Structure formats: C-alpha cells, structure tokens
C-alpha cells in the first residue's frame, strides 16, 4: 500500500478554496478546527436548530445552513451520520454543487452502496482518520497527527488525489502517515471490524463470560471485574504493541491459559460465521437491512438497545463504576 507523509502533500491545493464541513460531531469539529488552524477558509454547515451551532461559533468558525454552505464551497466534506447522508445530499447538497467541485467523505458507506451517486463532473474523495475526533484534534494541537486513509472514487479534475492528500495534511494526518485505499475496501473492512470484533464480537464475548461465571455461582461483582473492567488493561496492551506486547506483559499463567484455551472458544465454526458476516457486508445485504431498519423507525434496534440496557452486567457495572473516582462524572 502507498503511504504518504508531509513532503508528499501540498496545502496550497486548499489555499484560496472555500471549504464546507457538514456536521460538527466527533470528526466534524476536528476536521473544521484543524483546517481552520492550518490557515484554510472553513465554514461549518448545520441545521439552523442544531445545538452544535453555538459550539462551532464559540470556536471561531463560520456557521451556515447546509445548503448555503454547499453553495458557497468549492470542497464539501460530509461528516453526517450514515443514515442521514442520502436525504441531505438529495435535498441540500446535489442542487448546490457545480462542475469542478469536490465532494468528500469520512467513510465510504453511501458511495460504496450507491445511496449517493454524484454527478460525473465532480471529484469524489475520502479522508478517514483512524482515530476518534477528539484524538484527531488533540494530536494536531500538540504538533502531531493520527494515521489517515485516503481514497479517490471519482477524479473529474485530475487533481482529486492531490486534494485528498492536502486535506489529510491540513488535519495533521501526514505527520503520522496517510495510507491510500479505495471506498470498497475501507467500507467493507470497517463494517466487518465493527460487527465481528469491535462492537459485536467483543460485546457478546464479554456477556457470555459474565453469564458463565454468574450461572456457576460466582458474585456478579467479580464476574464484572474479570470479564468487563479488566478488558481495558488488555486492549491497551494490544493498542501499544500488538499481541506480543500483551503476552509479554501478563503473567505466565495468563499467557499459557490464554494460548491453550482461547482457540477452544474461537473455533473454526466461529471463523466460518465471521465469513458469513463478511459476505453480508460484501454483497450489500447488511447495508440494505440497515437502511430498511432506519426507514422503519429503528424498531429492531430500539428493542435490542432495551434488551442490552437491562442485562445484569449493565446494572452491576453502573454500581461498581460509581466506586471508581476516576470515572465518576461531576
């Protein structure tokens, strides 16, 4: 894969351009503020009734309704929730873009699954920091950055990649490294990771471990500590140095037990199911299911949220976290 750094990107590609960042959430605020501090002409596009309007203005940013921001801009970055992007695009973005504009995304979902089909005369790019927005902002203010992905879906002007690299540099990404990919690979790996490991697989593993201990007669408090609370300690080791760092850092007892018992839990049958999950991402079944869920008022999602919030691990966890001074919110 191609990896780019500071010397490979030219901020001059953005200078003199009008830049609209749509959304002011985790990623939106980081992109807008970092680009502003890099000397760019930035406007944030929001609904007039959005609670984020005041926050953005207090941070020194210009704020306009989405349609006005798009009409003014040469480059439009869409950092809105996946499920709202299509409607906003059709009502407020598409009617106000002109030939030669750049349409940018932080995630490839709507382009890859054809929910948004831009006209052929605009550039379509992606700049996706591989960190939450607060870290994108913090590392930038410290003079550093986080790794980013870039991709070009459509290059009408012949300059799309240069624009993507310049944007990545403007938010600090080239100080860490910018990896070139494509919308398909970014979207499919991102969704699979969320479903099979990060949000789906890990949550179910935690609940199954907790339930196993409680059903065997152990106190819920101990089960919580062993299966939920201490997971952060292990994940931090993975994050810092991979699997080897974790194995080096834990006791020999833990290392041996993990290496000999772990494969009994994550079996070939589990991997086979992971492949099915990946197939549903690849062929669009998950995307269609999620879109139908959104259009249907989130009935299934709301039911699942309620079921999860009522799980015993949530109740005992809330009680135990109140004992942890570093977690208690004032």
From Swiss-Prot:
Q: Name one GO molecular function term.
A: ketol-acid reductoisomerase activity
Q: What are the binding positions for Mg(2+) 2 in this chain?
A: 190, 226, 230
UniProt keyword Oxidoreductase, yes or no: yes
Q: Which UniProt keywords apply?
A: Amino-acid biosynthesis, Branched-chain amino acid biosynthesis, Magnesium, Metal-binding, NADP, Oxidoreductase
- Active site residues according to the UniProt entry: 107
**Which pathway does it operate in?**
Amino-acid biosynthesis; L-isoleucine biosynthesis; L-isoleucine from 2-oxobutanoate: step 2/4; Amino-acid biosynthesis; L-valine biosynthesis; L-valine from pyruvate: step 2/4
Give me the residues that bind Mg(2+) 1, please.
190, 194
- GO-annotated cellular components: cytosol
Residue limits of the KARI C-terminal knotted domain?
182-327
Instruction: Give one Pfam family, short name only.
Output: KARI_N
What is its cofactor? Answer: Mg(2+)
Source taxon at top rank: Bacteria
Binding residues for NADP(+): 24-27, 47, 50, 52, 82-85, 133
Stretches assigned to the KARI N-terminal Rossmann domain: 1-181
Question: What EC number(s) would the UniProt record show?
Answer: 1.1.1.86
Task: State the reactions this protein catalyses.
Answer: (2R)-2,3-dihydroxy-3-methylbutanoate + NADP(+) = (2S)-2-acetolactate + NADPH + H(+); (2R,3R)-2,3-dihydroxy-3-methylpentanoate + NADP(+) = (S)-2-ethyl-2-hydroxy-3-oxobutanoate + NADPH + H(+)
How is the co-factor bound, per the entry? Binds 2 magnesium ions per subunit.
Question: What HAMAP family does the entry give?
Answer: IlvC
Job description of the protein: Involved in the biosynthesis of branched-chain amino acids (BCAA). Catalyzes an alkyl-migration followed by a ketol-acid reduction of (S)-2-acetolactate (S2AL) to yield (R)-2,3-dihydroxy-isovalerate. In the isomerase reaction, S2AL is rearranged via a Mg-dependent methyl migration to produce 3-hydroxy-3-methyl-2-ketobutyrate (HMKB). In the reductase reaction, this 2-ketoacid undergoes a metal-dependent reduction by NADPH to yield (R)-2,3-dihydroxy-isovalerate.
Q: Which family does it belong to?
A: Belongs to the ketol-acid reductoisomerase family.
Q: What is this protein called?
A: Ketol-acid reductoisomerase (NADP(+))
**Species assigned in the record:** Chlorobium luteolum (strain DSM 273 / BCRC 81028 / 2530)
Source taxonomy lineage? Bacteria, Pseudomonadati, Chlorobiota, Chlorobiia, Chlorobiales
């Amino acid at each position: 894969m191609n990896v780019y750094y500071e010397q490979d990107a030219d901020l001059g590609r953005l200078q003199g351009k009008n830049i609209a960042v749509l959304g002011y959430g985790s990623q939106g605020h980081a992109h807008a503020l970092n680009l502003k501090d890099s000397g760019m002409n930035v406007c944030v596009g929001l609904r007039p009734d959005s609670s984020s309007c005041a926050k953005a203005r207090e941070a020194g940013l210009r704020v306009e309704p989405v349609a006005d921001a798009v009409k003014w801009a040469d480059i439009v970055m869409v950092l809105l929730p996946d499920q709202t992007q299509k409607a906003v695009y059709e009502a407020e973005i598409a009617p106000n873009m002109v030939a030669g504009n750049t349409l940018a995304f932080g995630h490839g979902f709507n382009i890859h699954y054809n929910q948004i089909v831009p006209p052929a005369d605009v550039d379509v790019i992606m700049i996706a920091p591989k960190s939450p927005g607060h870290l994108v902002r913090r590392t930038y203010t410290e003079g550093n950055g986080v790794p980013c992905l870039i991709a070009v879906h459509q290059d009408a002007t012949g300059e799309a990649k240069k624009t993507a690299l310049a944007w990545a540099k403007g938010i600090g990404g080239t100080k860490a490294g910018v990896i070139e990919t494509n919308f398909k690979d970014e979207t499919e790996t991102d969704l699979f990771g969320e479903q099979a490991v990060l949000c789906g697989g890990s949550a179910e593993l935690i609940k199954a471990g907790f339930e196993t201990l409680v059903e065997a007669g152990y106190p819920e408090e101990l089960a919580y500590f062993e299966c939920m609370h201490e997971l952060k300690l292990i994940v931090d080791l993975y994050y810092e140095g991979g699997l080897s760092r974790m194995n080096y850092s834990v006791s020999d007892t833990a290392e041996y037990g993990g290496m000999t018992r772990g494969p009994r839990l994550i079996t070939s049958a589990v991997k086979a199911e992971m492949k099915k999950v990946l197939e549903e991402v690849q062929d669009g079944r998950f995307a269609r299911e999620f879109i139908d869920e959104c259009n249907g008022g989130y009935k299934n999602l709301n039911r699942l949220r309620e079921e999860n919030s009522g799980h015993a691990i949530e109740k005992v966890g809330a009680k135990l976290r109140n004992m942890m001074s570093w977690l208690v919110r004032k």
